Amino acid sequence: MSRILLAPMEGLADDVLRGVLTAIGGYDWGICEFIRVSGSVLPVKTYERICPELLSGSRTAAGTPMRVQLLGSDPHFMADNARRLVTLNPAGIDLNFGCPAPTVNRHRGGAALLGEPELLHAIASAVRAVVPVDMPFTAKMRLGIDDTGLAVDCAQALAAGGIDELIVHGRTKRDGYRPPARWMWIERVRAAVAIPLIANGEVWTVEDFVRCQQETGCADIMLGR
């Protein structure tokens, strides 16, 4: 049984749009826009502002579970913020290693970290240590910064760090949102890790959905850009 998931889309998929899309039906769960973690533990109001679904059992009005995404590069502060987030009982916690925005990347966030598999492992391990085993813990990544040379290394580092599932957007940071998405590389990553993989990128139609499943070997698809 395949799942259809709603991607986090900064500047686009806010709580209003998430509510509209999930009201249509068909989404199994989604991820909110990222919450940036720097050198402090954020106040509860920050989490609730970016993901107001936390005030409603971490679900949209239609009942779709909404997970919370953290973005940052310091394992210590990522773990401290995850610890606070756990107290708000989110539907799950996701780590952002996929955002290609220059403003984010300049501050060592998102896809800019894909050249450092060891750091990805350190972040995932630190967060895993504070997230309950019964709370879904995932990460979302791209295929690399300028090329796909470290795609498998990054995926394996995150898997070894203890995430439950990995979402892979089939583009590099340099690719931005330009088509095509490299589905064949998602399949290579899937074959290299032992955890479930979710495919993301350039799925616009039912035909795209089926073809993406066939080319990646992934049953689950995340819809975004």
Regions found by a protein language model. Give the residues of each.
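Flavin-dependent oxidoreductase catalytic cores
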Residues: M1-R225
